[in-house]
A protein has these predicted regions:
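N-terminal chloroplast transit peptides
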Residues: 30-57
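Intrinsically disordered, low-complexity basic segments at termini and long loops, enriched
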Residues: 1-37, 417
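TRNA-recognition modules of translation machinery and tRNA-sensing kinases, especially anticodon-binding
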Residues: 275, 279, 292-303, 312, ...
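Metal-assisted phosphate- and nucleotidyl-transfer catalytic regions
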Residues: 241-268, 340-464, 486-509
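N-terminal plastid-targeting presequences
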Residues: 63-70
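Generic, well-ordered alpha-helical scaffold segments in large soluble proteins
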Residues: 103, 215-227, 283-286, 290, ...
Length: 546
C-alpha cells in the first residue's frame, strides 16, 4: 500500500528516523520536560501523518508519543512512599530518580505549578509531586481524587512544610476514577464508612487501623517465636463448645425439611456432611491444649465465631484471638506471659507506626494516647488484685454516690461490668493495667482449675484503661475426676469431650493459658472506640454485606 507522500519503505524509514530522534532526546535528558517532549512528539507525528498513511498492519496501537518514550530507556526503580517520607534522613534522597505508584489524594493546579499528593498505603503520609509548565499542568488536569497514578521524577528539596517532594517528569493515569467517588476530600463518619467497607481502607482512619493491625500481628508472632512457642493452626470447624455457652454458628449441608428434622432428633445430623453436629469454633484453646501437652509451649492465632446477638461497640460475631497454652505452668506464669506480650506488641507499634499513632492520638485519643501506650510499654509492672479485694474497693467507691453507676450492685459472685473494669484500671490503679484473679467458680468456665477454697478458680482477667477486659486466662484443670464433675455441673456431656479428658488420663501436667482479643487490642492501641472499625470487614448481627 502506497502513502500519499511516497512509497511504504520510505514511510517506515521516516518513522524509524523519528524514533531515533526521540530516543536520543530522552536518553540524553534534554532540558525540556517530558510533557514538552511528548507534545513535540505528537506534533511531529501529526506532521508525518499529513504526508503519508500507514498500511493496516503497521498502524500504531497507541500514540507514538506514548509508545516511543520507553524505547531504550530504563525506568528508575520504584520506591514505596514509606521508604521516602519516613527515611531517617529524607534529605539524603535528594537527586534520586524514582517512580512512585499509588492513588491521588489531592490535586491542585495553579498558573505555573501543579501539586499532586500520592499515597500508596505503605505509610500514613503521602508524597507531594510538583508539576511545572503548561504541558505538565494540562496532563495534571486529567487527574482527580481517587485515580491510580504512576509518577516518575526526581526527589528534590521542598519549599513547603515537608522536607522533600518529587519533581515530576512523567505521569501515567493507571486507572481513572469516575464521578461519584464517595471519598472526596472531607471528613466522613465511621458509620458511613462501614457502608462502603470495600473503599474505606483508602481513608486515613481505616488505613491507620490496618497498618497498626498488621504491625501488632507481626509483633505477636515475633514475640512467641522469641519465647520458644510453636504456632499451631487450630480448626475452624469443631464439634466442641469451649465456653459451654451454646452461642455457636452451626455448620451443615442440610436444608429445608431435612434440617428441621435433624434439629429435633437425637443424632439427627448423622446424615449431614460431618455425620454429626458441627459448629464454627468459639475458641482454639482446647485444641491448643492438646499440642501444649506434647510440645510444651504453643499458641494459636486465628478467627473465632460467636452467635451472640450483641449490638455493642465491643462485640463482633467474627473476631480474632491470640491463645497461648503453656505446659508445666501455673496461673502466675500465664499472667507473666500475657504482660510481656502486651508490652512487646505495644512497643513494636510505637516503634514502627509513629505517624499512624500520632493521627489516632489527635483524632481519637484526646492527646493522651501516646503517653498512655508509652507508660504501658515501658512503665511499672501491671497491678495484680484478687477478685474479692476488687469487689471490696468497688463497693466502697460505689457507696459514695450510687447514682453515678449504671450497675451499682456489686458483691462477691458479680460478673464485673465494663464500668467496673475501667474504674479499677483507670482510677484505682492510676491508669495502669491490672490483673484481677481468683474469680468465683460459678461465673467462669468449666475447664478452669478449682482453688483449694472451693469457691474460686485460678482464673484472671487483664483490665486495661480505656477498654476494660483485654485478656482472659486461667490455669487449666488437670485432674480428671474434678474436670469430669465440672462438665456435668455445667450441663455438658463428658462423652462429647472424651478426647479432652484423655489428656488428663495420659501424662497429665499442670498447664495454663489465656486468650487475648486481637481486635480489642487494635482498638486499645489506636484509641478507636468501636470494634467494628478495627477489622477490615466486621461481622455483627444483621451485617455480612461484603
Amino acid at each position: 500500500m502506497r502513502g500519499r507522500g511516497g512509497s511504504e519503505p520510505g514511510n517506515i524509514e521516516t518513522l524509524k528516523s523519528l524514533e531515533r530522534l526521540l530516543k536520543r532526546r530522552v536518553t540524553q535528558r534534554m532540558s525540556m520536560s517530558w510533557f514538552a517532549a511528548r507534545a513535540m512528539a505528537c506534533a511531529m507525528l501529526a506532521a508525518v501523518g499529513r504526508s503519508f498513511s500507514l498500511a493496516p498492519k503497521a498502524r500504531l496501537a497507541r500514540p507514538l508519543c506514548a509508545a516511543t518514550m520507553d524505547v531504550g530507556v530504563e525506568a528508575p526503580p520504584r520506591l514505596k512512599i514509606k521508604s521516602i517520607v519516613e527515611a531517617e534522613a529524607p534529605e539524603s534522597l535528594v537527586g534520586t530518580k524514582t517512580v512512585i505508584k499509588g492513588w491521588a489524594r489531592t490535586v491542585r493546579a495553579q498558573k505555573a505549578l501543579g501539586f499532586l499528593e500520592v499515597n500508596d498505603g505503605s505509610s500514613f503520609g503521602g508524597l507531594q509531586c510538583v508539576f511545572e509548565g503548561e504541558a505538565a499542568l494540562k496532563e495534571l488536569k486529567a487527574v482527580s481524587t481517587g485515580c491510580a497514578v504512576a509518577v516518575e521524577g526526581e526527589i528534590v528539596k521542598s519549599g513547603g512544610k515537608q522536607a522533600i517532594e518529587l519533581k515530576a517528569e512523567t505521569l501515567e493515569i493507571v486507572g481513572g476514577c469516575e464521578e461519584g467517588y464517595p471519598l472526596q476530600k472531607k471528613r466522613h463518619s465511621l458509620e458511613f464508612l462501614r457502608s462502603i467497607a470495600h473503599l474505606r481502607p483508602r481513608t486515613n482512619t481505616l488505613a491507620a487501623a490496618a497498618r497498626l493491625r498488621s504491625c501488632l500481628a507481626q509483633a505477636t508472632h515475633s514475640f512467641f517465636e522469641q519465647e520458644g512457642f510453636a504456632y499451631v493452626h487450630s480448626p475452624i470447624i469443631t464439634a466442641s463448645d469451649c465456653e459451654g455457652a451454646g452461642e455457636m454458628f452451626r455448620v451443615t449441608s442440610l436444608s429445608g425439611d431435612a434440617l428441621a428434622k435433624a434439629a429435633t432428633k437425637e443424632n439427627g445430623f448423622e446424615d449431614d456432611f460431618f455425620a454429626r453436629s458441627a459448629f464454627l469454633t468459639v475458641s482454639g484453646q482446647l485444641s491448643a491444649e492438646t499440642y501444649a501437652c506434647a510440645m510444651g509451649d504453643v499458641y494459636t492465632f486465628g478467627p473465632t465465631f460467636r452467635a451472640e446477638n450483641s449490638q455493642t461497640s465491643r462485640h463482633l460475631a467474627e473476631f480474632w484471638m491470640i491463645e497461648p497454652e503453656m505446659a508445666f505452668a501455673t496461673i502466675t506464669e500465664a499472667m507473666d506471659n500475657a504482660e510481656a506480650l502486651l508490652k512487646s506488641t505495644i512497643s513494636a507499634a510505637l516503634d514502627k507506626c509513629g505517624a499512624d499513632l500520632k493521627f489516632c492520638d489527635q483524632f481519637y485519643g484526646d492527646k493522651e494516647l501516646l503517653d498512655r501506650l508509652t507508660s504501658i510499654a515501658t512503665g511499672a509492672p501491671f497491678v495484680r488484685l484478687k477478685y474479692a479485694d476488687a469487689v471490696d474497693v468497688l463497693r466502697a467507691e460505689i457507696a459514695k454516690d450510687p447514682s453515678k453507676w449504671q450497675f451499682p450492685d456489686v458483691e462477691f459472685g458479680t460478673d464485673l461490668a465494663t464500668e467496673h473494669e475501667r474504674w479499677l484500671a483507670e482510677t484505682h490503679c492510676g491508669g495502669n493495667c491490672v490483673f484481677v484473679y481468683d474469680y468465683p467458680r460459678t461465673i467462669k468456665s468449666f475447664y478452669m482449675r478449682d482453688n483449694d477454697d472451693g469457691k474460686t478458680v485460678a482464673a484472671f482477667d487483664l483490665l486495661a484503661p480505656g477498654v476494660g477486659e483485654l485478656v482472659g486466662g486461667s490455669q487449666r484443670e488437670e485432674r480428671t475426676d474434678k474436670l469430669e464433675a465440672k462438665m456435668v455441673e455445667f450441663g455438658l456431656d463428658p462423652e462429647d469431650y472424651w478426647w479432652y479428658l484423655d489428656l488428663r488420663k495420659y501424662g497429665s501436667v499442670p498447664h495454663a493459658g489465656y486468650g487475648l482479643g486481637f481486635d480489642r487490642l487494635v482498638c486499645y492501641v489506636s484509641a478507636i472506640e468501636n470494634i467494628r472499625d478495627s477489622i477490615p470487614y466486621p461481622r455483627y448481627p444483621g451485617s455480612a454485606t461484603f
